[in-house]
Amino acid sequence: SAPSPLAAVNPDIELISHHTRIAAENALELISDYDIVADGSDNFPTRFLVNDACFLAKKTLVFAAILRFDGQIATFKPHQTDAVGAPFPCYRCIFREPPPPGQFPTCAEAGVLGALCGTVGSLQATEVLKELLGIGDSLAGWLLVCEALGTMFRKIKVKRDPGCPLCGDAPSIKDLSAYEC
């Protein structure tokens, strides 16, 4: 394979390529060697699969998504607690179930503002670095919403949902077997 531009900048970096799609059968194996998972997937089934796998494997998830002129970034680590001992939420605490197909347009159908991809991606990378280095204020327990047309950012406080089917008090999701692949 061709040399990576990243290796040219830092020859000490170890790059691992996975030439496969993430699926229920391989999700836990794919993320097992990593401390943090950065999800920038463009479809709901993958987002939910990655969230569920990260929860089951006790991995921190830094999520980012965009559509049209809006973006969202959040850090999920429901296996950890905040300063007062309350567990952090997972993705399903905010978005319980994937929406029915066709309820929301895809990025290909609706389009995305190219510059917003860079902005949201840079914020996601910053959150990953903050988590790895243990610096700054984590976005765990928050949803950062970026509205490009109004040049506005909002931080929305989110809490663990005791009724969450994954991390709640009586979870019904205990593995990835419900995913169709």
Regions found by a protein language model. Name each.
Residues 1-181:
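Adenine nucleotide-associated cytosolic modules
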